[in-house]
């Protein structure tokens, strides 16, 4: 091999070893997400309604809906909808219900909706979430929602958490779950409009 051909061969090896394409293949973003319109456990009943199921790590789009539900004495609602998706540098989830009534009207609302998102920027993860409630009434009292994790005590040893948010952003990984309403009590656990989003940035 002459000197010219040797130089060309060395250049080709350098291109293959230091190619940006090889580096790009390692920079993989993975996603997580799930949205559930109504999750309830009470008196031997277990419900997961309008549940998207978990989003694959590769991302994609999942959605589900239900016209109405009525479990006597426990929960009734209309227009249950849930979506979760992941692509590019972000994942998002959303869930909503209308005409909600829980525990015979102890908790009621015209519209209940939650949203969450997780994004990557410069290799770092960030998460955001929000709950929207229209016409929320608990034990006959109108409730205005502002900050997350508003706790309200109700009769019968029942507690209500409004705009419940739990998040764990840490470096290149982040996850957040927003439960628009969470009712807990003796043998009762009800979550309305839950939206979880997560991401790992590489």
Task: Please identify what each model-predicted range represents.
Residues 2-10:
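Bacterial N-terminal signal peptides that target proteins for export
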Residues 25-202:
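Extended, solvent-exposed, non-transmembrane regions
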Residues 10-20:
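Bacterial N-terminal signal peptides
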């Amino acid at each position: 091999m002459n000197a010219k051909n040797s130089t060309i061969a060395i250049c080709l090896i350098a291109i293959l070893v230091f190619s940006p394409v090889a580096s790009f293949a390692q920079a993989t973003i993975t996603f997580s997400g799930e949205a559930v319109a109504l999750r309830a456990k009470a008196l031997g009943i277990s419900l997961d309604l309008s549940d998207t199921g978990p989003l694959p790590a590769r991302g994609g789009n999942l959605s589900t809906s239900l016209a109405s539900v009525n479990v006597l004495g426990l929960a009734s609602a209309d227009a249950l909808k849930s979506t979760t998706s992941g692509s590019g540098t972000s994942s998002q989830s959303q869930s909503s219900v209308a005409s909600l009534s829980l525990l015979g009207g102890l908790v009621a609302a015209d519209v209940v909706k939650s949203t969450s998102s997780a994004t990557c920027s410069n290799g770092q993860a960030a998460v955001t979430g929000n709950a929207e409630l229209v016409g929320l009434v608990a034990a006959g009292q109108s409730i205005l929602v502002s900050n997350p994790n508003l706790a309200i005590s109700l009769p019968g040893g029942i507690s209500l958490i409004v705009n419940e948010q739990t998040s764990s952003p840490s470096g290149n990984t982040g996850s957040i779950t927003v439960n628009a309403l969470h009712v807990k009590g003796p043998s009762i656990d009800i979550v309305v409009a839950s939206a979880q989003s997560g991401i790992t940035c590489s």
